[in-house]
Curated annotation (Swiss-Prot):
Compartments it resides in: Cell inner membrane
Lineage, opening ranks: Bacteria, Pseudomonadati, Pseudomonadota, Gammaproteobacteria, Lysobacterales
Function text: Part of the ABC transporter complex PstSACB involved in phosphate import. Responsible for energy coupling to the transport system.
Protein name per Swiss-Prot or TrEMBL: Phosphate import ATP-binding protein PstB
Main location: membrane
Residues noted as binding ATP in the record, renumbered to the chain: 53-60
Domain of life of the organism encoding this protein: Bacteria
Gene name for this UniProt entry: pstB
One Pfam assignment: ABC_tran
Catalytic activity: phosphate(out) + ATP + H2O = ADP + 2 phosphate(in) + H(+)
Length: 267
């Protein structure tokens, strides 16, 4: 497996990490609009990679290609390759159910299902696996613990998830995503609708989750990118301008566009 240099999870000297996801000469079209242009990027395993850039730059589009969610909509086309463990997930031969189980996603706005807290987490598991009642209970508890929510909901698993606070709902969505034990977790501006306290809790959770998952996060908050990510990619108008260690991007960017953006002189 190809490896790239990234910061060690502990902040220790540079360590070698396998490449988990790689885009190769990736182009994307919304009908005739060329939204992404020859993107080449490598996402290291069990690290956090942040995608930053102004609105409309293509960062959320790139994120959604990583689990082919665009396939739900007409007149959208991806060209090139996206390799997950060296397999091209854009190939028609790559099973969608397999992709959904290997790549989880959490959206900007919390979207709990209109069912109990327990059933929110169990829903996806039932779609992909057949577990005994005891095994299902254990899996749900494990996911809620990983989502840092178990202690808050363990006595009300039968209550509606819609009664949770916004921050709790987002952590429930994270628990629901990790319940399938995916390899990759995609986070599309997961804290933009949350208060500062809930945002801080999610950021702490991301730091904990990268021990088990490869994480890609889209954020408009550059301070957040600096806090939570090991790698950062700056995008503009469908191009990948620069991709490097987060500390390098924010302290010694190699591209003037990157420096202008992170210092507020962009425009």
């Amino acid at each position: 497996m190809h490896r790239i240099a990234v910061p060690a999870a502990t902040g220790a000297p540079t360590a070698q990490a396998p490449v988990k996801v790689a885009a190769r000469n990736l182009d994307f079209y919304y009908d005739k609009y060329h939204a992404l242009k020859s993107i080449n990027i490598e996402i290291p395993e069990k690290r956090v990679t942040a995608l930053i850039g102004p609105s409309g730059c293509g960062k959320s589009t790139l994120l959604r290609i990583f689990n082919r969610i665009y396939a739900l909509y007409p007149k959208m086309e991806a060209r090139g390759e996206v390799l997950l463990d060296n397999e091209n997930i854009l190939s028609p031969k790559y099973p969608m159910n397999r992709l959904r189980s290997k790549v989880g996603m959490v959206f900007q706005k919390p979207v709990p299902f209109p069912m109990t807290i327990f059933e929110n987490v169990a829903y996806g598991i039932r779609h992909h696996e057949k577990l005994s009642k005891a095994d299902m209970q254990n899996r749900v508890e494990q996911a809620l613990r990983q989502g840092a929510l178990w202690d808050e909901v363990k006595d009300k698993l039968g209550q509606s998830a819609l009664g949770l606070s916004g921050g709790q709902q987002q952590r429930l969505c994270i628990a629901r995503a990790v319940a399938l034990r995916p390899d990759v977790l995609l986070l599309d501006e997961p804290t933009s609708a949350l208060d500062p306290i809930s945002t801080s809790r999610i950021e702490q959770l991301v730091e904990e989750l990268k021990r088990d998952y490869t994480i890609v996060i889209v954020t408009h908050n550059m301070q957040q990118a600096a806090r939570v990510s090991d790698y950062t990619a700056f995008m503009y108008l469908g191009d990948l301008i620069e991709h490097d260690r987060t500390e390098t991007i924010f302290s010694q960017p190699s591209k003037q566009q990157t420096e202008d953006y992170i210092t507020g002189r962009f425009g």
